[in-house]
Design a protein with these regions (language model features):
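Short acidic, Gly/Ser-rich segments with clustered Asp/Glu that frequently serve as metal-coordination loops
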Residues: 8-13
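A short alpha/beta connector and helix-capping loop motif
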Residues: 14-40, 45
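Active-site-adjacent betaalpha module
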Residues: 33, 46-171
């Protein structure tokens, strides 16, 4: 999972920010329980601050600082994906029409499959958000929701972590 630019100075003005934060927390908890890869990006952290502390994983994640809007232009990030043999990016964060869109479009061009968590991304302006979603899906990105992707990752109720996963969803 790729969490893009959830920094305090940016998120203040995001539409539906409380819901976005709540869903990213659910995703983080599920990803940590299921021991899935977590990557975090920060756009110009010296000016925009760092990732909101409550949205940092407990352990086992990689953080990338960037100046380009697209994380997919950062060689260090691309090397990490290659080393971990990751070809499907699950994306959440802000802002849909800037850093998310540029990262997604560049990733699709590089051959990655991209899934957008529609209820865990946002922009300041809903028109920008909606148009960016349309552009990314027309380019090949897949839309899903927080709950859907969590159950997709879990795969079965027989999995030992299922009860914990169900509890995350029910919160």
């Amino acid at each position: 999972m790729l969490i893009i630019d959830i920094q305090e100075k940016i998120i203040r003005s995001i539409s539906n920010k409380d819901s976005i934060i709540k869903n990213i927390k659910k995703l983080l908890n599920a990803y940590q329980i299921l021991e899935e890869n977590i990557f975090i990006s920060e756009q110009n952290p010296l000016k925009l601050g760092v990732t909101m502390p409550e949205l940092l994983p407990i352990a086992g994640f990689r953080k990338f600082e960037k100046m380009d809007f697209s994380l997919a232009k950062l060689e260090e990030f691309l090397k990490e994906l290659k080393n971990k043999k990751i070809n499907n990016l699950i994306v959440c964060g802000i802002e849909t029409h800037i850093c998310i869109q540029q990262t997604v479009l560049d990733s699709l061009k590089k051959g990655y499959e991209v899934t957008l968590i529609s209820d865990a991304i946002g922009s300041r302006n809903m028109v920008d958000h909606e148009i960016a979603l349309q552009r990314m899906t027309h380019s090949g990105a897949i839309l899903t929701t927080t709950e859907s992707i969590i159950f997709e990752l879990c795969k079965t109720a027989d999995r030992k972590e299922f009860k914990e996963i169900r509890n995350i969803i029910m919160r």
